[in-house]
């Protein structure tokens, strides 16, 4: 089994547990160049989203694939979710290690007011 397949299997296990809880989830995806975050309802409707591919976020950054960029994405997605009335979510790290950009995004979202 290769690295990507292992990550996707971990992600499926976590998503199944979150689905059983029936709560909104904060989904994180990262690539070498960008970081993406979405708040998704139990009915699989995207309630809020932010990424380093957006012009509004990219204008604040020098580089898009680092920890500082992930912090901006976390803060932005949390603010947008709170505007929509979502304050409590489950954190879905998509099988990525809770380290570096993923952890930075989570910490920034917590500081901006999301609870998980």
UniProtKB/Swiss-Prot annotation:
Signal peptide: none
Gene Ontology cellular-component terms listed: cytosolic large ribosomal subunit
Keyword Transmembrane helix: no
Alphabetical keyword list: Ribonucleoprotein, Ribosomal protein, RNA-binding, rRNA-binding
Database matches in InterPro entries: Ribosomal_uL18_bac-type, Ribosomal_uL18_bac/euk
MF term (GO), any: structural constituent of ribosome
Pfam families xrefs: Ribosomal_L18p
One GO BP: translation
Domain of life: Bacteria
Subunit structure: Part of the 50S ribosomal subunit; part of the 5S rRNA/L5/L18/L25 subcomplex. Contacts the 5S and 23S rRNAs.
Functional note: This is one of the proteins that bind and probably mediate the attachment of the 5S RNA into the large ribosomal subunit, where it forms part of the central protuberance.
Family, similarity comment: Belongs to the universal ribosomal protein uL18 family.
Descriptive protein name: Large ribosomal subunit protein uL18
Gene name, Swiss-Prot/TrEMBL: rplR
